[in-house]
């Protein structure tokens, strides 16, 4: 089952963020409300299979972060505050106290819980938090230039290398070849895409905002000592971006009400639907831990 098939039969809705921007979402299931917040280079559809795995026990909401699907565009002043306001708008509309987030989505969920948004439990899959700015934000200038020049494949390769997310084969091959392969993959995806499919090409402009979010929150680990929500830190034991493990370990010691669970054989995309750009996704493996955590009173 692919993400498009998994979303068949889901209903749609929307919430209005503090600045008036529409935040669209998919909805499925019956029971207490749970919001699943996707990470960078993803959309609401990226966790459709995880939503279905939880839908017999929860009403699951899958919001599109800005610039994707049914949600409105980024504004000039977009930043962490905006992301928290967008998530808060959805949790308020859904009357949700339970949030799962992955990567930057996990970071946003933790920040929203810290801001007093009424979130009671957060399941955070490999939160994308930098212990310091370091080398993981230096790619943004080149990325913006390449995207502005219409070199989408080049921009995506720049972000993959800058965030230590490039597949091993891409790290070894000449950059022009990696760009050519990425461009061919995008063209193939474009030909097959339906009107609601969120393709790599459509997602590319959103990547910069995740990079800016990383830069804005770099070095803020101490702030998370203020989070009063119960937190389940989730992750895989495979190769991750280099900054994930230090943050994962630091958060487990900083968050006052946290526990951790790690999954053998999973990587940074472990909770997301499997597909051409995420061949290692195994949401069915992650779902039981989330279900158990959210079922606790």
Describe the function of each predicted region:
Residues 41, 65-69, 129, 265-270:
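Alpha/beta-hydrolase active-site loop signature
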Residues 240-247:
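Conserved alpha/beta-hydrolase "acid-adjacent" motif
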Residues 182-219:
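Hydrophobic, aromatic-rich cap/lid helix
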Residues 257-297:
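Catalytic active-site module of serine/aspartate enzymes centered on a nucleophile-bearing elbow/loop
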Residues 227, 233-235:
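Short beta-strand/loop motif that positions the catalytic acidic residue
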Residues 61-100, 104, 276-285:
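Active-site loop/oxyanion-hole signature of alpha/beta-hydrolase fold enzymes
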Residues 14-72, 76:
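Conserved HGGG/HGGXW glycine-rich cap/lid loop of the alpha/beta-hydrolase fold
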Residues 96-135:
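Conserved hydrolase catalytic core segment
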